[in-house]
């Protein structure tokens, strides 16, 4: 039996109809040949934020070409030039057979191309010759996109045939996204220029939103202005007015590309370029009659299905948002998400998280370029069964290993702005390409995980602030605040149980002399050694603190009267041992006053502390005034 072929598909914007059509053909061919497809897809260019695009395009860094036999590269769907160059360089370095679509910029790759120019020229010629358009504006895709450039050049050539020039202010650029059409229409309306006879758009998505914007302002299409598109999408065919556009055999292009790369893997000699023909579709937006003769009942049924699906999608998003808002940990979030994966029509879904994605501190462990060396999959939903997959090498990419061919796995990024959190894997289902919900679900999951990360950071910061509030930074024991908080509970417990309590007040002797004669670093060192001696004197359940300056305090429970003497002797013995070990030119000495008593009704914690302080002072008065060793 032949080894199963593994193919990588690199693409952006799989929710768009162009990408959909090609991917459908790729999948059909892969199934016919029992090959597996791993599709790495980003939704780049959706918003203007640079950080968001960095997070999206990072998914391409996941592709480990050492595990693939061939590459299908839809480089024409990626608008960022730096990302294009980076991906192309990696594919070239891999040495794998690679097929691109509609792109002649990389002659070392094989190319499945649909003739963008002939049909576009015929469409523009029709607008000028048959409908009398003289003033034309053009809405292009990205200037760096070869398809966009081909369509624009075709438009200019035909305009030149008729002596028509498109001035620079009448040339607009977008990202092939629907919002570009609306923004361009708004820009044209705000310019104060006379509207053109025709607005020619480089794709249907931009053309349709331009029509909507102009219609809202009382401008009729085609009566006041002709608008055309390119792609002959479902929405273009069923819009009113139906869109004059260019139809392309997208599914056939995808099938041919997959078939080509499989034959290349098998060692066949193949032509570098395969060309498919596109055809102009003249419809109502230019003033022609639509050629569409679809059964009205079927169209109504299809439209109802779209509306009903949209309603269900909104309901699902609302429920998911509400439930994810309650999640406060990775486990809780995965539990919520697992309850919705059954609605996504995939055989299997995986959530793979970077090690340290929930790092508490903003600058610690943040990944924006690539992934952590190890990943873990806190959620694998497999035909209704939920399981956890532990740590695995990121080079493996997919925690689910396919033992058969004909599988399609979509790898989609999980991130917050440029911060990489992990990725989502959807296996054998149409959800990533056919559902309007996919991108929103991924953003919901990402935002929920980021909220959890921030909650972890906030709780960590609160704990650190609390520690700083109650811990003395020099001696690393309680400060006055920490002691009062801890001692108050022990004091009340002793009173309730009618048990004796021990309170010792300790004051270092001669700290000023150490600071003055040997420097403050030595003074700090002496305080730390005294602190460690006091800690060593504490039994289990006792607490101690630096009460301020050179003053320390110790509180003990479960004590007897003789513990006052035992504590004093232990303290002096250990202090002597410290001095002997240090062999410093000064002695660390301290005065101690201790109270052991059963708490009476009128006693207070501060009252007993004051009593211990007075006893300490009486001991200090008996000592000489010189503490420096000569």
Please tell me what each predicted stretch does:
Residues 323-365:
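Helix-loop-beta substructure at the N-terminus of cytosolic sensory domains
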Residues 430-450, 459-463:
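Amphipathic alpha-helical "output/dimerization" segments
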Residues 543-546, 586:
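A short pre-motif secondary-structure segment
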Residues 1-319, 323:
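Bacterial carbohydrate/catabolite-sensing allosteric modules
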Residues 296, 520, 565-572, 576, ...:
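Catalytic-core segments of nucleotide cyclases and related cyclic-nucleotide turnover enzymes
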Residues 466, 479-502, 512-536, 545-549, ...:
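Conserved long alpha-helical elements within nucleotide-processing catalytic cores of c-di-GMP signaling
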Residues 398-402, 406-415:
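A short, aliphatic-rich beta-strand micro-motif
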